[in-house]
């Protein structure tokens, strides 16, 4: 069966499909960053169409959430520069999700969509300790996650890869 629908540009036009997705636990991964890519570096035709497609996507996200579909943050392998995943969270907020919903879309629901919810996606005993600590409150401004100067600690599987917190407290 189908586990997720990627892109889903015109899901907003089929409420029955959205209800079925919710009933069957099928995730929706809108990949807004693809439209940013086409708008910024696409052909003139792609640039012209990006705005219209984006509006369909916004409506698709809103209707999917209203139908009970889990919307997941994702990018497009090969279709966008990697390392900008936090930009997708901003796009989800711009589409009507709360910052908390966008964070869940990029963590817990994303892990569930990939079948990894027992290992990652939430901070729980027995799961890998994957954490990012930022200087700011992403629940007030999701864009703090995109500002690399505000990332103060990165931990993957319990191992600290970057720790600027100790520098702040030592000074």
Region spans (language model):
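Short, glycine/charged-enriched secondary-structure capping and boundary segments
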Residues: 1, 19-21, 43-44, 86-89, ...
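Short loop/turn motifs at secondary-structure junctions
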Residues: 1-4, 68, 128, 150
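Active-site core of metal-dependent hydrolases
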Residues: 1-58, 77, 96-98, 111-114, ...
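Extracellular/periplasmic catalytic domains that process cell-envelope and extracellular macromolecules
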Residues: 12, 20-22, 64-66, 124, ...
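Generic structural signal for individual residues within well-ordered alpha-helical segments
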Residues: 19, 103-104, 143
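His/Asp/Glu-enriched, well-ordered alpha-helical/loop segment
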Residues: 53-137
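C-terminal cap of metal-dependent C-N hydrolases
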Residues: 112, 125-170
């Amino acid at each position: 069966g189908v586990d997720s629908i990627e892109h889903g540009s015109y899901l907003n036009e089929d409420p029955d499909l959205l209800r079925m997705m919710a009933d069957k636990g099928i995730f929706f991964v809108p990949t807004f960053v693809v439209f940013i890519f086409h708008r910024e570096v696409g052909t003139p035709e792609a640039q012209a169409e990006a705005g219209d497609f984006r509006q369909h996507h916004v409506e698709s996200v809103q209707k999917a959430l209203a139908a009970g579909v889990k919307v997941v943050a994702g990018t497009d392998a090969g279709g966008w520069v990697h390392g900008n995943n936090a930009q997708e969270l901003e796009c989800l907020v711009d589409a009507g999700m709360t910052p908390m919903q966008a964070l869940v879309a990029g963590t817990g629901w994303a892990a569930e969509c990939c079948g990894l919810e027992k290992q990652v996606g939430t901070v729980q005993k027995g799961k890998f300790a994957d954490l990012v600590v930022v200087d700011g409150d992403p629940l007030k401004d999701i864009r703090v996650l995109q500002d690399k100067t505000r990332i103060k600690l990165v931990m993957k599987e319990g191992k600290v890869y970057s720790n600027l917190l100790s520098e702040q407290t030592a000074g």
